[in-house]
Regions:
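Acidic, His- and aromatic-enriched active-site or binding-groove loops in soluble protein domains
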Residues: 303-331, 475-499, 555-580, 673-685
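Low-complexity, glycine/alanine/valine/leucine- and proline-rich hydrophobic stretches
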Residues: 768-805
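Acidic/aromatic-lined carbohydrate-recognition and catalytic surfaces
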Residues: 240-480, 511-527, 546
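Conserved alpha/beta catalytic core and glycan-binding cleft of carbohydrate-active enzymes
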Residues: 371, 613-627, 631-774, 778
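Active-site neighborhood of glycoside hydrolase catalytic domains
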Residues: 443-453, 517-663, 671-673
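Structural preference for beta-strand elements that scaffold enzyme active sites
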Residues: 248-252, 286, 458-462, 534-536, ...
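Aromatic-rich carbohydrate-binding modules that target alpha-glucans
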Residues: 2, 8-55, 65-91, 144-192, ...
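Basic K/R-rich, polyanion-interacting modules in nucleoproteins and related proteins
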Residues: 1-11, 99-151, 223, 228-244
Length: 825
């Protein structure tokens, strides 16, 4: 089988175009191959590949590589095509294939190809269509985002075979899944060259022709001279039609915060299904959760922090719905029910007692069920699907519990990971290690059911992708080579913390991760996509650069951005000031290269400088942090983020708050990543409040995040700020009321819903603030996190059961009316 590739792409000096080919052999094995292309003019790149192995199907994508880096791994890849909808073809060893392609950037309407869009619009997953191949075949492919249920695509052109421009004789195309349509036509019925267009056909037969000039077939070429059978594939990008803007409203709530009459002291996967009912009833289409992964390290309240997981894959046992898992021992069952009723009556989560009770229960359940033939069959299948992470996780958990610590350096056995030794350990402790796999199987089953239920109610789940991993995690033990274990990630000083934030997470070794095409990230996101249709990248700035702090530093003030372009002493002096070591921090990897010390302006070391040196340092400081790195950091992000986007069909959202370089917005826009917009944290310097009507369409609007106070709490925190908001934003005269009344809450919520943002996601507390009879009278109880307190106890729970929300007719009708008026229903 011969594959001939041709693509138009204008490269820069030192760049090459290559094809990344993946084919499935007749034995079911997947093979990868890189094919370098050649060019005579720097614009048209061509190449030939001979596939000798018998194949079922193949797919390919184009990449741009650095000619100075010779590698078959991910090293040297400068850019990738958008590949969410793959170029997938049936293989026929007797044929020659010709591909006439254009580089695929992220489409304007890339959100239409996501699971979130599919779920919210109630679209059914389309099975891939198979098309007939003739002895000589033209194969047309086009993307058609934003089609309504029942709409389809057809092809019409200037020849009898193509309908002679008669829309009633247009050739219906077949959906191939994820918004792509295709059709095969015998070349024997076509005269070259020919012209054609795509049309959209409505369920009622109405027709809409695509905009722009007619499309042109390629002229006669080498393909027409081939003896035997051939396929010429025309990948035509996206149909040229305007896509209606899609806007939805949704709910933000931590899973642990949910409460039902049957909860066991914490929100669980069963409660999630009940909350899905309320979300759908109120006209919303999304639920955003905090991370739900296992954080079990010390079994103290500090494990309540959801961003310090011991695994990026394993779900937290605390979220098991025990109502679905009854014990055979009726006496024990009754005893546990009394315990969880007491825990559920508490106003806040008692993390220590809840996890203690749930683990005790799950151990008893394991003893009762582990010999079950049905369970063993399901369990074996589950283990086989995820063995890459499950075995290390299960052994890690058993060793943690054996030695009483998750600090694996203190373990007497297997303090360093060894695959064969870990496998032998699991075999010799199969019963004990098997418990953790058993629990993960139960959790996976319950969450998968909840996700499928959400899909049936046209509600999509949005997950949270933490920026870091715990230094005491499975990943740090299993694959330490992927991380800088001697460094910690954090954030420079900002509105949340004057000394910055030291999160304690090791930073990523991006060069090592690139060697296998970011396998670690692809597996992580593939796991998330089993449950979620969208996700939030926590601190997306970390994919451009990370605030890196030497491990053990008490604060983040001694950190520096990595990667970076630090200054030489000569560069510093070129700003018109002598080198003052107190104002700088030496680069961690490059001796005699310097970073201006973050936040030093205004401190004693800066104040004692002469005025002209103060001004020179301010120029240097602003240039270094806001201009010098823009192109460099953008190029770093463009190496990493496309791999994340292509790893799944989830809608990608970024948390881009804080000290945001100018390059971040354009890169997110280019990749179709939704930004985060918070009116009280404007991205324009010196402006007290952002203007909601200026929000970009590709964004998530929210009133406040989990790191901030709720709307009512914020209203009371700063009277001067509240008065400014009341007069200038809400445009009310007079003195702002000291308490935020329900009608004012509703007005604020309506303003946010009416913003141009694609998603408007509002916290449960702020939705409930509309109704003075339902909202929590204790404002402080609604606070989820206080970032300035690294030991904060994450324990907020809603003060009333979900059933009360389902019965709250007045509130639900009010919310539905607001959503419908904002065209988000």
């Amino acid at each position: 089988m011969k594959l001939n590739f041709s693509i138009e792409y204008r490269t820069e000096w030192g760049q090459n175009v290559e094809v990344e080919l993946c084919f499935l052999s007749s034995e079911g094995k997947t093979h990868w191959q890189r094919i370098p292309l050649e060019t005579g003019d720097g614009l048209i790149w061509k190449g030939l590949c001979m596939l000798k192995a018998r194949s079922r199907q193949f797919r390919y994508t184009y990449i741009i590589t650095d000619s100075n880096v010779q590698s078959d791994t991910g090293e040297g890849i400068l850019r990738r095509e958008w590949d969410v909808v793959p170029r997938l073809f049936p293989a026929d060893d007797a044929r020659t294939y010709f591909f006439f392609d254009h580089w695929r950037d992220v489409p304007e309407a890339s959100y239409c190809f996501t699971d979130a869009y599919e779920v919210a619009n109630g679209l059914k997953k389309q099975a891939s269509a198979s098309v007939a191949l003739f002895p000589r075949t033209f194969l047309f492919r086009v993307l058609a985002p934003g089609l309504a249920e029942g709409e389809r695509v057809a092809l019409v052109g200037d020849q009898p075979t193509l309908g002679n421009w008669d829309e009633e004789r247009a050739l219906p195309m077949m959906p191939s899944g994820h918004g792509e349509w295709l059709i095969s036509i015998s070349a024997d019925g076509l005269r070259l060259p020919f012209q054609y267009k795509y049309i959209k056909v409505g369920q009622d037969g109405s027709v809409r022709w695509e905009d722009g000039p007619n499309r042109q077939s390629p002229l006669n070429g080498q393909w027409s001279m081939v003896n035997g059978q051939w396929v010429l594939a025309l990948s035509d990008g996206t149909i040229r039609l305007e896509v209606p803007r899609w806007k939805v409203a949704g709910l933000v709530v931590p899973l642990f915060s949910l409460r039902s009459e049957g909860s066991q002291g914490v929100g669980d996967f069963g409660d999630l299904k009940e909350m899905i009912d309320w979300t759908a009833m109120a006209g919303m289409h999304a639920i955003q959760l905090l991370p739900i992964y296992d954080t079990t390290q010390s079994r103290t309240y500090t494990d309540s922090y959801p961003y310090n997981a011991i695994s990026v894959h394993a779900l937290h046992p605390i979220y098991a719905d025990l109502r679905r898992l009854p014990l055979k021992d009726k006496k024990a069952m009754a005893s546990f029910q009394k315990k969880w009723q007491k825990l559920n009556a508490l106003p806040a989560l008692d993390y220590v007692e809840v996890i203690k009770m749930k683990e005790e229960y799950l151990h008893l359940l394991y003893e009762e069920e582990r010999q079950s033939p049905m369970l063993n069959g399901q369990w074996s299948m589950f283990n086989g699907q995820i063995a890459d992470w499950l075995l290390p996780y299960c052994v890690f958990c058993h060793l943690r519990d054996t030695y009483g610590t998750s600090q694996f350096s203190k373990w007497k056995k297997l303090s360093s990971y060894n695959r064969s030794a870990v496998t032998k350990y699991a075999e010799s402790h199969s019963k004990e290690v098997g418990y953790y796999a058993f629990v993960q199987h139960l959790l996976h089953t319950q969450l998968a059911e909840a996700a499928e239920y959400a899909r049936s109610r046209r509600v999509f789940l949005k997950g949270d992708l933490p920026i870091g991993i715990s230094p005491q995690s499975v990943e740090a033990w299993h694959e330490p080579h992927l991380f800088h274990m001697d460094m910690s990630a954090g954030a420079p000083p900002d509105d949340f913390s004057r000394t910055g934030q030291n999160w304690g997470f090791p930073t990523y070794d991006w060069e090592r991760m690139a060697e296998d095409g970011y396998r670690w990230w692809r597996q992580r996101l593939g796991g998330m996509s089993q449950y979620f249709s969208a996700y939030r990248i926590d601190h997306i700035l970390g994919f451009f650069r990370i605030w890196q702090i030497p491990k053990g530093s008490p604060t983040a003030l001694l950190g520096q951005f990595s990667p970076a372009l630090p200054l030489s002493v000569g560069e510093i002096e070129s700003y018109g000031m002598p080198f003052e070591p107190e104002l700088f921090v030496e680069d961690a990897t490059q001796p005699d290269r310097w970073h201006p010390r973050i936040g030093v302006i205004g401190e004693e070391a800066w104040r004692r400088l002469p005025k002209y040196e103060q001004d020179a340092f301010i120029r240097l400081y602003e240039d270094f942090y806001y201009r010098r790195h823009n192109d460099f950091w953008a190029s770093q992000a463009m190496k990493k983020l496309p791999a994340l986007i292509d790893a799944s069909n989830m809608l990608v959202c970024g948390e881009d708050l804080g000290m945001v370089p100018a390059c971040v917005g354009p890169v997110m826009q280019r990749l179709g990543i939704l930004s985060l917009e918070i009116q009280a944290m404007p991205k324009t310097y010196g402006v007290p409040f952002a203007k909601l009507h200026e929000n970009p369409y590709r964004s998530v609007d929210t009133i406040f995040t989990h790191d901030m106070p709720t709307l009512r709490l914020w209203w009371k925190e700063n009277r001067e700020r509240t008065q400014l908001y009341y007069n200038n934003v809400l445009e009310h005269d007079g003195t702002a009321p000291s308490e935020l009344f329900g009608w004012l809450c509703e007005e604020i919520v309506a303003h946010h819903l009416n913003s141009p943002s694609m998603l408007c996601l509002i916290s449960l507390q702020d939705w409930l603030s509309i109704d003075e009879s339902l909202r929590n009278p204790n404002l402080e109880e609604e606070r989820i996190n206080v970032p300035a307190n690294p030991k904060h106890y994450w324990r907020y729970r809603m003060h009333l059961p979900i059933s009360k929300l389902l019965e709250a007719k007045a509130l639900n009708e009010r919310i539905l009316m607001l959503i419908e008026r904002s065209e988000r229903a």
